Amino acid sequence: MTKEIAVKEASNMLLQEPSTPSSQAVGLSSSPSSSIRKKKVNFSSELENSPGGNRPSFGLPKRGILKTSTPLSSIKQPNFQSFEGNESEKETSLQELQSSFCSGIENLQHVEKSARIETYSKLSSFLKIYTPSLPEDPIFPLLNQLCNFLLSDRCSNNSEGSPDFQLNTQANKLLSILLWHPTISSHIQPETATVFIEQSLNFLEGPKLTKALAAQHLHLLSCQKCPLSIHPLCNRILDVCFNISFPSLVIGQERLAVLTKILSQFPLEFSRRVVDWAPYLLACLVDASRPIREKALLLALDLSKHLYHDKLVARTILANFRSDIKGTAFVLIMTEQFEKLVIEEDDGVYVAHAWAAIISVLGGARISSWEYFNTWLKIIQLCFNSMNPLTKCAAQTSWIRLIHEFSLSETLTQATKRLTLLCQPISMVLGSRNLPTVKNAAMTTLIALIYACLRPGISDAMLSLLWDSVIVNILEKCALKNEVTIFESSNILLALFNTLSNGVWKDDRLVCRESVEAKELPKLNPVWVRANCSRTIEPVKTLLLLAKPDHTVKTTTPARKQHIRGLSYEQSSSVWSTYIKCLASAGQKEIKRSVETGRAICCICSSLHKFLYSKSIRKDELYVERVSRFALMVKSAIEAFGINTFVEASYLVSDNQLVLIDQTKAIDSYDHVPISPLIYLLHSLALLTNGTLFSTVHAAYSSILSSIEEYHLRFGLKLMLLWDCVSPLSDDGTLVLARVLVSHEVSRLTSEALLSELKSRNGNNSVEEGFSEEERSILLKLLSWNVKFCSISDAGSVNNLLQQYFTAIYKFEGCGSVFPFVVDPFTTILDDVLSFEANKVYSFAISLMKVSTFESCTKELPPVTLPENIRQHLDSYNHMVELYNTLLQRLSSSDQVDLQCRYLHELSEFIKKIPKEFIFHTICKLSKGLIPCFLMNAFPQLEKSTTLQKSCTNFCILILQLLLNSTATASNILESLSPLLTSGLKSISKEVVLAAIKFWNQVFGKFESEEYPIELQKTISYLSKTYIILLPFQSLCPGGKQANHQSSEKMSDILKGVDELRSVSKNGPYASSQDKGEKTTEFSGPGKPNNDNYIQIASVQELDDSSKGKAGKMPASKKNKRQKGDVKKIDETKNEATDMEESLTTPSGKVNKEVIVDDTSLRDEAIVPDKAIDVADNSNALLKENISSQSNRKADNNGTPSVNNSFTTANNDECSKENSQIEPEGQTASREGVLSTPRSTRKKRKLGRKSQSSNVNKEVAISEVSATLENVEVIERHGISEQGQNLDESACVLTNESSLSQTEIPEEKTENETTAVNGFENSKKRQFSSLLSGSIDTNNESNKVSSVEFDKSGPQDIIQSMTEATFEIEKNIQDLKSEEVQKLSDLLMRLQRAILSRIA
């Protein structure tokens, strides 16, 4: 058995009365062992056939009265066994029960004395456990007959004439049970009961009274429950008690029991005899016999119950205390005896309760003026200081009696002194090391003290005194800081702040046997709690810091009450929410927020701030847990007061504390900006953001901020609150993570608020109104802040906010407001943050592109009106495009290929949506950024990423295509975009160069102007050596005008011939697959054609070392330099115009032979000579044609596969429609051919060709021309179309690799160096280039050339002759006259037509 059980029994048994009749009372032991284990005597098994059932509600006697007796077998025994068994056996029918009871009574008439004794014993055992079935129980009619037998037998004599002790004893025992039984005694007639009591009094007053009989009859008087029969005999009973003089312990106990019974039945009559029983009671309280002391204690305790504040009793007791016994006051004698009991006998439990009984009898009025009160206090002081924990617990319980009598005070001064006295033993126990049982007993006393002080109608001054003296000094400073008592302390606070409590305060509650529980405490006045918020919140703050996780709280279960060690987070949250509701209830009826409520809000917010930043009191506390609890506490406060109270900006922050603004002063007089409580709390939480707590703070911040959306505030107020959340974080550079966190939540909630506002306005049938200027201003400020401080991962949330903002403006303001309210402000925002992280800016710029300005406006405005709408906001549009241009210029510096590709793709999609009237204007604004993209020499990752190559190529081709389809004229393009065109021609990307040449031929091929920039002319002139390009400008050709005029007629004839050839080609076996409706497969990347679908080009075998090259050899130094240049990479020369050949080289290192057909020439087919035909520069109009050797010609004749040279075109799926091309039958071998000559051999041949001089013999020249004519094959090309139209290409032919690698852009010649002959030769060169490109109509000349018969002589002879003639012409070209040169040109055109007709 634990000590807690012993404490409870020791404190409660003194308050219990004897519940069953007993010949000897059972009291408390003087030691813990005796109080824990008590002797109990049961009836003999021989006397009772059953051990008896459970104790009934009215009690059982603890010991049998009679000794064991042997049953007589000769006498018929009534069957009472069936009533003493289990519950099933007790369900005998009423008839059987009545017959059995009747048989027992009949036996009393006929049996002998010994049989009656046994019958009485059996009936006693039966009636003790029997519960009658009212109101028709079969026993009730037989009670009178049984009483008659008892009346005769309890006074019968034996044969010698003396009283028969055994029979009398059994009869008295049975009679005591009948009069004690709560149900049976009420069915005994009062007259019969009075006869029994008078008969007992006669025995007690008679001369033949013995000690045994006296004890039996006194026990009957103490057990009876017949008040109607006792009332006339009350004084007589008291006299008998006082006159019995047997020095017996049993008689002393029974006498005190009789006095206690009379006190409970007739307290007034008992109080009148106080003079008789008071000295006896006080003497028994200090008696040497423990049972006597305990019986006296029960009587004293009943005095406080039945004669509470009886003045006569109190005066008599005080008079007896003052009485002099041998020169010493009786009170001093009692004090001395009590000290001995505490110190020597360790019976402090009894002393404490006796001390409390006297206090209750005297009352508070007598105590305050009693001269021996301090002496009396020394007795309980010994109990408080005892080493016995049971004595300490009893002392705490007894102290409640003094609290009950001493707590009521008339003045504040008196109340202060009394509270100081009453709190001292409680704080002493709670503030020092003691056993948990002692501390729990002290907590019970504390609850009783609070209960006694919180009387109805208590004044505010008394309430403040109670709070400071009890709650602060004891509860907060002592009880809350111990894990044994903290849970009960939280229950006290819950009860005090619970506004829903409806408990009724009772004046005599502390006198009751049961202890007061915390839930019975009266609630505090909410108005007083709010007015004293700074004081009442302190214990709550302490409790919050001391709480622990729920799983760490330990629960112990002593005998009667469950004890919890520690305080859980859940319990602390309950205390906080209850306290907040108490504060809020004080202002429920307020129409406008009062000053008191405002101060309470300040107190709450400041306390939450301290809770968040206070140092940990518990060693095992995790700060993460505190952040989560902070969010729950804030939400409970908002729920209690309402969101409007927490969003009112009527507060200031001073020293990190929230202060209410004085309404009498102007807001401008304050240095700080007003702030709302919600923003103050959110800012306090955001300052904790770091790497460890980021996720926890993020979750807490999101939980609190969601209140803005939950309570359905108006849209403008939501925006203002969200702006207040972010504005304090702008100036502090150390709050990087806090900005990221807040940006994520604010951008999300702003988007949700906009979406909700859109839905609400759409659901409203009223006229839709736009946003106010203030709302738009706040939205833009929120966008600006989030763009500046959000993380890359949150850029999507900000982009969503921009999209929602655009939708709202477009919906309520119209399409015309998009540019001034969305595009221009957001562009300004991005301009301001260009110095920040590049990835974010590009993401936001892409989002701005996705705001479908043109597409959305088109839905509302017709296409004709759309350009006008843009013109109205041209400044905003230009501002946006200039931003894109700036980002495009910086794009090459990024090291993220995905970002570069994405930006180029999104910019392409944006440009496609622009009306064609603004394409030229937009490209002009983007020209500075487009130049690096066209050159492609500023992208470090270009060589490693085929994706980036493809993106850049597609982007550049799209720009050229859109510019071609725009409304801009050639002069406008030349004036504004010549640097861009020059960049395209100088690009390191082969596809971009080809697209630029195509664009040149289509736009400027026939456009003559004196304003061609020199750099453009130089670039075109340089490329004309490699490609067939129309050269309309004359800045490098001083004599070009006359030559052009002389050859204009011939050019028109050539153009006609080309048109005729086009018509023939379309119907030929190699017609373009575009006419067949086939699709084109997209290439895998720039410079790398797809293996499944590519353009088939005529291949040419490598020239033999003996037959290729021109006169002269390359110097050794130049040759070494060339060999070293072959080893260098692209990035070493990508910025020089002289390295254009590297961009035209395939990944395998082979030179592509490609053709671009001009719009005026072949649309579906193109013809390329064997090798690249190099047009002579401005000083030499010579045809430089590579011819293969005899061995190579022989290999070709034998069917050796030749090199496949592919032309790759970057496709743009968005701007063009692809058309497939299928190879005609018979050309598969040409497509699948491979290069049989090693690469090293080819390189040597190329170097050899370059090193040869221009003076070669006639035979070699004729053989080269013959080889050229013999190895020309057909070329199949893709067609590029947009909107159903084919994209035409200008024809161009590449030279071999060696000629490209060593060619440089010629420097501009002076006027002295430029002659009329050079200009004339330039004009002839352009004619010849046009002829090779197929731009000259050859329809009129087809018959002349086609009549040449190659079959009459051998092909070798014809080629040899032409080679000799060619070398002869080269040797004497300078001596020819202009007419002769003109004739030579005609011959060459005829030869070209013949070649073309043979190919077709």
Swiss-Prot record:
Compositional bias of kind Low complexity: 22-35
* Alphabetical UniProt keywords: Cell cycle, Chromosome, Nucleus, Telomere
- Regions of compositional bias (Polar residues) in chain numbering: 42-52, 1065-1074, 1090-1099, 1177-1230
Q: Which residues, by range, are in coiled-coil regions?
A: none
User: Where does the protein principally reside?
Assistant: nucleus
Q: Where in the cell is it found?
A: Nucleus; Chromosome, Telomere
Q: Where is the composition biased (Basic residues)?
A: 1240-1249
Biased region (Basic and acidic residues) positions are 1123-1137, 1151-1174
What is a single Pfam family found in this protein's UniProt entry? Rif1_N
Region feature (Disordered): 1-63, 1065-1258
- MF-aspect GO terms: chromatin-protein adaptor activity; G-quadruplex DNA binding
GO terms in the biological process aspect are: telomere maintenance
One GO location term (cellular component): chromatin
Q: What does this protein do?
A: Negatively regulates telomere length. Appears to play no role in transcriptional silencing of telomeric loci.
How this chain assembles, per its entry, is: Recruited to telomeres by interaction with taz1. Does not interact with rap1, unlike the orthologous protein of budding yeast.
Family according to the record: Belongs to the RIF1 family.
Protein name (Swiss-Prot/TrEMBL)? Telomere length regulator protein rif1
Organism in which the protein naturally occurs: Schizosaccharomyces pombe (strain 972 / ATCC 24843) (Fission yeast)
Q: Which gene encodes it?
A: rif1
